[in-house]
């Protein structure tokens, strides 16, 4: 029995050909069907050149297991989340490799209610069955049906439920879909704005879906992927810039000067907006950078709740706490009314409405927060011995630390600064985040000291 290396901690991702191909996709479909025994599931795929073929092989595996398949076509991951909870079906699978290189593809799996299927919640079971490849013969009388459906209008209806279009004043927005799956959704949102008479002008960059990614793999978390959005904001004198990754489950924002705004400060902005409408609500955040979020949420009368990093952990904690909103500094934003799932479309609509309601630019809204809690942003270091390096840092700072937290990696808090250090699940990399209380130089000094310690 050959092991399938495309099964990762939270999803499926692999190099095309050997790690992931149509035969393996069929086996994954068959295994999902045998393990969960769903009646109906939804399928979708991103713009990658292999997504359609892998999706159809997956569908055949599911049908062979007796599962009815509803195919929503080219879509972002959150459209599968939406379809799963909106239709009340038993699960969903999106074929996507998000921002991975061209020669990769993958899958994100959910069960009923758009709950994630990850390592300890069924993914290992699906892997075991797919690897064994020992399925009962196909019963043609019980073979599942296949149907193509279109839910785009219902999805856009849902998105517009988060804002009041009457609050929108004249806005010019640059939106960079990166030739990914976001383009058609942006078109549908633009058409809806026009139909409702909203004074919003969208300047669309790289809006045509193209699995060849002629303008590079869309991953605005990387500074080298931000120039086209920044330049368009400056050229057109736009109020804000928005950029997506390939399956648009993350959304990245740029202010009116084309400056990239770290996702950390957007979490505070959205938390405050939700608490204005829902006083006393719980807000979930990750441990990497937290002081700004805790400060904003507490001041607004909400309850901040820290969760381990990663979508499966955040979603589980949101359900447990019945939190209205959750945010990670990595530009993942989660919403209770979106079945506790993450969306890349809801955040920019909310921020656009906030710009109009507050009568302030995005830059003005986050400037004070950025000054109050300056942050390093996540710095990755490739190390031969990551565990030893983390232990070295902990020993060095243990005497002066006021608090130590191990929710995710290690967080150490001092009077005027704090840091979080965690190792990657998938590679020999440690990820460092540092923040201070209103002191950029202190933050920079401590960041340098930590990086030096790590590399010794």
Curated annotation (Swiss-Prot):
List UniProt keywords, sorted A-Z: Isomerase, Lipopolysaccharide biosynthesis, Magnesium, Metal-binding, Phosphoprotein
Catalytic activity field: alpha-D-mannose 1-phosphate = D-mannose 6-phosphate
Q: Domain of life, per the record?
A: Bacteria
Q: What binding details are noted for the cofactor? A: Binds 1 Mg(2+) ion per subunit.
Q: What class of enzyme is it?
A: isomerase
Which SUPFAM superfamilies would you find in this protein's record? Phosphoglucomutase, C-terminal domain, Phosphoglucomutase, first 3 domains
EC number, as in UniProt: 5.4.2.8
In terms of Gene3D superfamilies, this protein maps to: Alpha-D-Glucose-1,6-Bisphosphate, subunit A, domain 3, Alpha-D-phosphohexomutase, C-terminal domain
Which is one Pfam family of this protein?
A: PGM_PMM_II
Q: In which pathway does it act?
A: Nucleotide-sugar biosynthesis; GDP-alpha-D-mannose biosynthesis; alpha-D-mannose 1-phosphate from D-fructose 6-phosphate: step 2/2; Bacterial outer membrane biogenesis; LPS O-antigen biosynthesis
Q: Which GO terms describe its biological process?
A: GDP-mannose biosynthetic process; O antigen biosynthetic process
Offer an example of a GO molecular function term for this protein.
Answer: phosphomannomutase activity
Membrane spanning segments where?
none
The UniProt entry annotates the active site at: 98
- Named cofactor requirement(s): Mg(2+)
Which amino acid positions bind Mg(2+), per UniProt?
98, 245, 247, 249
- Recorded coiled-coil stretches: none
Q: What does this protein do?
A: Involved in GDP-mannose biosynthesis which serves as the activated sugar nucleotide precursor for mannose residues in cell surface polysaccharides. This enzyme participates in synthesis of the LPS O antigen.
Q: Which family does it belong to?
A: Belongs to the phosphohexose mutase family.
Q: What is this protein called?
A: Phosphomannomutase
What is this organism's lineage?
Bacteria, Pseudomonadati, Pseudomonadota, Gammaproteobacteria, Enterobacterales
Gene assigned in the entry:
manB
């Amino acid at each position: 029995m050959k092991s399938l290396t495309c099964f990762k901690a939270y999803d499926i991702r692999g190099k095309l050909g050997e790690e992931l191909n149509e035969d393996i996709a069929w086996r994954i479909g068959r295994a999902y069907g045998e393990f969960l025994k769903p009646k109906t599931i939804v399928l979708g795929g991103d713009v990658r050149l292999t997504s359609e073929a892998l999706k159809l092989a997956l569908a055949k595996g599911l049908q062979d297991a007796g599962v009815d398949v509803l195919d929503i076509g080219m879509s972002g991951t959150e459209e599968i989340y939406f379809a799963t909870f909106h239709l009340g079906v038993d699960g969903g699978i999106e074929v996507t490799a998000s921002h991975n290189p061209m020669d990769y593809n993958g899958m994100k799996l959910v069960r009923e209610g758009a709950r994630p299927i990850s390592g300890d919640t069924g993914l290992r079971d699906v892997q075991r069955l797919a690897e064994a490849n020992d399925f009962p013969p196909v019963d043609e009388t019980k073979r599942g049906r296949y149907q193509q459906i279109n839910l785009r209008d219902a999805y856009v209806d849902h998105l517009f439920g988060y804002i009041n279009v009457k609050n929108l004043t004249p806005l010019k927005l640059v939106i960079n879909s990166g030739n990914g799956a976001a383009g058609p959704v942006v078109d549908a949102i633009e058409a809806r704005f026009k139909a409702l008479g909203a004074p919003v002008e969208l300047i669309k960059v790289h809006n045509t879906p193209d699995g060849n990614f002629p303008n590079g793999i869309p991953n605005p978390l990387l500074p080298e992927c931000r120039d086209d959005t920044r330049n368009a904001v400056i050229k057109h004198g736009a109020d804000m810039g928005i950029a997506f990754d390939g399956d648009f489950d993350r959304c990245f924002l740029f202010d009116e000067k084309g400056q990239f705004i770290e996702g950390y400060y957007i979490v505070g902005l959205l938390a405050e907006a939700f608490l204005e409408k829902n006083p006393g609500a719980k807000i979930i955040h990750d441990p990497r950078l937290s002081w700004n979020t805790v400060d904003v949420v507490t001041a607004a009368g909400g309850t901040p709740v820290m969760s381990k990093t990663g979508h499966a952990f955040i979603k589980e904690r949101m359900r447990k706490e019945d939190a209205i909103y959750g945010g990670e500094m990595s530009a993942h934003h989660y919403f209770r009314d979106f079945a506790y799932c993450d969306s890349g479309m809801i955040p920019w609509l909310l921020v656009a409405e906030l710009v109009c309601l507050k009568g302030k630019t995005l830059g003005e809204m986050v400037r004070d927060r950025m000054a109050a809690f300056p942050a390093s942003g996540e710095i990755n270091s490739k190390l031969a011995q990551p565990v030893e390096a983390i232990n070295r840092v902990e020993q060095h700072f243990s005497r002066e630390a006021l608090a130590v937290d191990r929710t995710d990696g290690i967080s150490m808090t001092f009077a005027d600064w704090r840091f979080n250090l965690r190792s990657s699940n998938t590679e020999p990399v440690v990820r460092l985040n540092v923040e201070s209380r209103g002191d950029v130089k202190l933050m920079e000094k401590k960041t340098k000291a930590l990086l030096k310690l790590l590399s010794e």
